[in-house]
Design a protein with these regions (language model features):
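Mature catalytic core of soluble alpha/beta enzymes
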Residues: 2-11, 15-226
Length: 226
């Protein structure tokens, strides 16, 4: 090849091709697994500082910790232990549990009780909790009895110590998944990942973009009525 300019151009093309093939920052990676009776999924670009296996291990460990603190489906979880206390009993909550509950109580106050994490007795009565499913509506007297046990204002959280007023059954399902999503996002950012999409049971958090700078897109199930 006698044309030095053409030779140089071909070298540049070859170099660019090899670089593109080795560019992990433009590659979409995905991790997933089961959690909280549903599934979790993390999509990201780039390479985690300690590698993908270490990131997945950290994610699974974090989700397990949240389950052990806030899952009413685990009889030995912190929330189940509180729900089983006699009136006047107290429990020192794990720090994440205390933070989530404090946020939930703030939301209850801001909405004048429209949002209330003590609604567990009604959730269970209608068959949406850890109790066996039911296929008929509960009796009116059972509904009223369950309602008497509901009321966020009954709770007293002193720093991390929560006192059981008697009969209160906490259910953090409406907020725990969102907290877990934020927790996983923090793990990704700590690992040097700034472009990601985290999803747990329909709860989402996104940052940055997909490869080639494309925006993250999520599907909405049956967005059109009917």
């Amino acid at each position: 090849m006698r044309n030095p300019l053409l030779r140089f151009s071909l070298l540049l093309v070859a170099f660019a091709f090899l670089t593109a093939c080795d560019d992990t920052t433009d590659r979409l990676s995905q991790l997933s697994g089961p959690t909280m009776g549903t599934s979790w999924s993390v999509k990201f670009t780039g390479t985690p500082e300690n590698g993908v296996p270490a990131l997945k291990s950290a994610i699974e460990s974090s989700l397990e910790d949240i389950n052990q603190e806030m899952s009413t489906y685990l009889p030995d979880s912190a929330i189940s232990r509180f729900n089983g206390l006699e009136a006047g009993g107290s429990l020192v909550l794990p720090s994440d549990f205390a933070m989530v509950l404090d946020e939930a109580l703030g939301l209850a106050e801001a909405t004048d009780g429209a949002y209330d994490v003590t609604v567990g007795p009604l959730v269970n009565l209608w068959g949406f909790g850890p109790d066996p499913e039911r296929f008929e509506p509960p009796a009116a007297e059972d509904i009223e009895a369950a309602r008497q046990r509901v009321g966020w204002h009954k709770l007293k959280l002193d720093d991390r110590t929560l006192t059981q007023p008697g009969g209160v059954y906490l259910d953090l399902s409406s907020i725990a998944k969102g907290f877990a999503v934020d927790k996983l996002a923090h793990l990704l950012e700590k690992a040097g990942i700034s472009n990601y999409l985290v999803e747990i049971g329909g709860e989402l958090r996104a940052s940055g973009t997909k490869p080639q700078g494309l925006p993250w897109r999520v599907a909405v199930e049956r967005p059109i009525p009917g």
